């Protein structure tokens, strides 16, 4: 019955920019009062496609092919330009212009990170200003100044960084690059390191389940990374970085020559567009961008004096080439190509895989090659901008080899994805929908060999597998002006092994008044486990790996269930003024319950078990965050987050390992007034407190059990990071910074580190930093 309902609603074909955008334009006066703006101009940058807000400040506009930036303008208010990456709702608050009559300069303010309170999804936006507050060498390091996402090392040896949202590992967060699912499969842990920070334009962080048009895999959250492209890339951007840990980087962004500034577009009335259309020939426009990244580190350091490298030695080359085609009559296309070549070495301090003697030491040597291509094609009806078709096509090949001490891993992934969408409205602009079809193909071929053998209770189970998943979906949006917005999504997928997967989701927003908003989020999510790469930190040990799936004959991969969860959240947002200065308070709570899960059990020393959940597994999260600008150019962001993440192990219901229950966070940012030549100083500091974490039962470095009968707890600790940037002029910046300024280190991060041939050798239970105080310097040059 569900299939009949969805198939009847689905109109098939095509998507990337396949839906309209609606929202409200609000003006905020200097005394803090807000009211909707009537007649505000809303238009797409570089086009003549625009509209104006109605008597309620509301607008709706179609999305032309290649559209990336939406401009908002109104008399007596500072214009604003927002990035578009597939949102259905974009709301904006324009500030009353502050005019210096002597210099005739108009100044506006824009936060480095902000919460969109008018979109029914609860998402936070991190822009380039926020990303520049830290070194942000790659995407996995871009969340150091964010309270909603935890970033930590997966183990004490490989240097792999992973994220957590709502107390759950990053594998439960769907990560998109330009609205295309990207970090999944064999890249589920390493994938965030594949994207250099200077390539990123914006990051959109969604707590809870995301839109069903992107698939069923978002369980704890969704992160959409908007990469620089031909529409948003600088004409030339060079970023050079060097750190005291031996890491050096060079990043290059090259974009097309920019068109005329959008301020020159005036009087974009519809009748003018029609008249000019009769006298101008249709034209086509092709533009491209190139993103390049090269990095390496060959400095051997051991600051915590445990005999192992603090950070891996590595070399990395990444390239991205993207082309946009903007045709006439509403047709457009985008093509992007990606390449990564990454090599890493870590382990004992003198380990060298190419040396006959030193290669006998315990070490890790990995080699990764990744090729990816994606295409988007869209069509918007010229006379019906609210009606559009679109398509996304994505293909990748991922090849990874690795020696991990006594174990060797080889993995290949061949994946393809098609997403076809149609968007339109029902009766009027308040009722819109998006429907479509998707097909996902994954072919995994991975093997793990070891002197400490892989143990599988039923030998026919193999690590290699193939997934074929067609699916259909329908998403309805009700937008009752500025008061209430609701998005209801239904999705049905058909997995070749796990059968039908039904995914309902709901996002609703209610505006209590001009300052307070309430949101409700709920839905389901699924994923199939990729045992080795989901848990690559376990290879930083000599643990025996035991896959203990169902004993009865089954087609399930490894005899393990598909992971299935239900997520619900409630979000309250207040936007107003404190002492006549803008402030935002956000309070949220989320509950995630697993109906089925692959439990990863480290509770027995020397072993790691994989088995189906037999009992409860859940995560409860609550967070409060305050953003305030007490004076112009000075921002304060404070947050507190509480977590309760527990799973039923064979030993009973216990806290999930290495998850801190409490985290307190403060970020301070100040910049001086710009001089006539554009020069200024910028200062940023972040302080955070991380509470203790549960460490699974281990053997001490002296070969004796810990004093506590089943587990131990880490210490809590503080971390401080800071950065100073000097802007010589508008296109040249020098920055100097430091991380872990408290110099806190874990000195016993590796269990039995002096007995690397023991089955009890274990570097997989890292709970804090192993590298002490670190300084860095960098340069940004933009044209």
Please identify what each model-predicted range represents:
Residues 284, 390-394, 398-401, 511, ...:
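Membrane-embedded beta-barrel scaffold of Gram-negative outer-membrane proteins
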Residues 89-93, 139-142, 161-164, 176, ...:
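N-terminal periplasmic accessory domains that precede
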Residues 59-62, 180-208, 319:
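Short acidic/polar hinge/loop motifs at secondary-structure boundaries
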Residues 689-703, 725-783:
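C-terminal beta-signal and adjacent terminal beta-strands/loops
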Residues 30-32, 38-45, 73-77, 87-132, ...:
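Short, acidic, small-residue-rich periplasmic hinge/interaction motif at the N-terminus
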Residues 585-593, 612-698:
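Gram-negative outer-membrane beta-barrel transporters
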Residues 140-184, 201:
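Extracytoplasmic beta-strand/coil segments of soluble accessory domains associated
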Residues 297-318, 324-389, 395-415:
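Flexible loop and strand-edge segments within Gram-negative outer membrane beta-barrel domains
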């Amino acid at each position: 019955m569900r299939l009949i309902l969805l198939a009847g609603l689905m109109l098939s074909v095509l998507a990337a920019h396949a839906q309209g955008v609606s929202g409200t334009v609000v003006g905020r006066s200097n005394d803090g009062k807000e009211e909707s703006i009537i007649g505000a101009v809303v238009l797409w940058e570089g086009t003549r496609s625009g509209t104006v807000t109605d008597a309620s400040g509301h607008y709706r506009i179609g999305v032309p092919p290649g559209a990336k930036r939406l401009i908002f303008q109104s008399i007596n208010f500072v214009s604003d330009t927002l990035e578009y990456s597939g949102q259905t709702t974009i709301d904006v608050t324009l500030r009353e212009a502050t005019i210096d009559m002597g210099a005739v300069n108009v100044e506006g303010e824009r936060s480095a990170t902000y919460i969109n309170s008018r979109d029914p999804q609860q998402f936070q936006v991190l822009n380039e200003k926020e990303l520049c507050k830290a070194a942000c060498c790659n995407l996995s390091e871009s969340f150091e100044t964010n309270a909603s996402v935890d970033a930590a090392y997966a183990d004490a040896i490989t240097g792999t960084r992973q994220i957590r949202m709502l107390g759950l590992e990053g594998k439960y967060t769907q990560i998109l690059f330009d609205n295309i699912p990207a970090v999944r499969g064999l890249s589920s842990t390493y994938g965030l390191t594949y994207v250099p920070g200077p390539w990123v334009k914006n990051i959109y962080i969604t707590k809870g389940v995301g839109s069903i048009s992107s698939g069923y895999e978002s369980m704890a959250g969704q992160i959409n990374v908007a990469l620089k492209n031909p529409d948003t890339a600088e004409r030339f951007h060079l970023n050079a970085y060097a750190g005291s840990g031996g890491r050096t980087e060079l990043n290059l962004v090259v974009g097309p020559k920019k068109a005329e500034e959008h301020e020159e577009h005036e009087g974009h009335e519809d009748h003018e567009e029609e008249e000019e259309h009769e006298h101008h020939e249709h034209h086509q426009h092709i533009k491209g961008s190139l993103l390049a990244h090269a990095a390496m580190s060959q400095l051997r350091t051991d600051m915590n004096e445990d005999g192992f490298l603090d950070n891996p030695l590595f070399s990395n080359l990444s390239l991205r080439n993207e082309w946009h085609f903007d045709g006439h009559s509403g047709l457009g296309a985008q093509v992007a190509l990606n390449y990564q070549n990454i090599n890493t070495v870590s382990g004992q301090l003198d380990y060298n895989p190419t040396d006959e003697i030193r290669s006998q030491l315990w070490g890790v040597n990995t080699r990764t090659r990744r090729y990816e291509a994606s295409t988007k094609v869209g069509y918007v009806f010229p006379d019906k901008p609210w009606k559009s078709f679109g398509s996304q096509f994505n293909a990748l090949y991922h090849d990874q080899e690795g020696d991990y001490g006594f174990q060797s891993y080889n993995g290949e992934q061949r994946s393809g994805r098609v997403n076809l969408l149609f968007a339109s409205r029902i009766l009027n602009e308040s009722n819109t929908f998006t429907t479509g079809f998707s097909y996902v193909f994954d072919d995994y071929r991975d093997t793990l060999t070891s002197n400490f053998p892989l143990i599988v209770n039923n030998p026919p189970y193999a690590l290699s597998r193939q997934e074929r998943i067609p699916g259909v979906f329908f998403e309805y949006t009700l937008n009752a002006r500025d008061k209430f917005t609701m998005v209801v999504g239904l999705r049905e997928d058909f997995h070749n092994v796990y059968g039908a997967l039904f995914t309902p989701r709901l996002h609703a927003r209610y505006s209590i008044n001009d300052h307070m908003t309430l949101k409700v989020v709920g839905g389901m999510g699924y994923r199939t486990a990729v045992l080795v790469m989901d848990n690559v930190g376990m290879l930083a040990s000599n643990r025996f790996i035991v896959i203990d799936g169902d004993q009865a004959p089954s087609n399930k991969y490894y005899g393990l269930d598909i992971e299935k969860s239900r997520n619900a959240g409630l979000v309250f947002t207040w936007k107003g003024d404190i002492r006549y200065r803008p402030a935002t308070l956000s309070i949220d709570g989320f509950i995630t319950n697993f109906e089925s899960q692959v439990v990863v059990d480290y509770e027995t020393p020397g072993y790691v078990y994989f088995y189906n959940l037999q009992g409860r597994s859940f995560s409860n999260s609550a967070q409060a965050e305050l953003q305030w600008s007490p004076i112009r150019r000075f921002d304060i962001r404070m947050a507190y987050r509480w977590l309760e993440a527990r799973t039923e192990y064979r030993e009973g219901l216990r806290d999930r390992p290495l998850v801190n229950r409490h985290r307190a966070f403060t970020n301070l940012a100040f910049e001086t007034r710009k001089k006539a030549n554009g020069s200024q100083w910028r200062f940023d500091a972040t302080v955070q407190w991380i509470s203790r974490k549960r460490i699974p039962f281990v053997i001490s470095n002296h070969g004796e059990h810990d004093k506590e009968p089943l587990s131990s707890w880490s210490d809590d600790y503080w971390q401080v990071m800071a950065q100073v940037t000097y802007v010589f002029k508008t296109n040249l910046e020098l920055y100097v910074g430091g991380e872990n300024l408290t110099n806190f280190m874990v000195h016993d991060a590796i269990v039995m580190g002096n007995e690397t041939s023991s089955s009890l050798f274990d570097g997989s239970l890292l709970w804090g930093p192993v590298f002490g105080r670190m300084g860095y310097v960098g340069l940004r040059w933009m044209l």
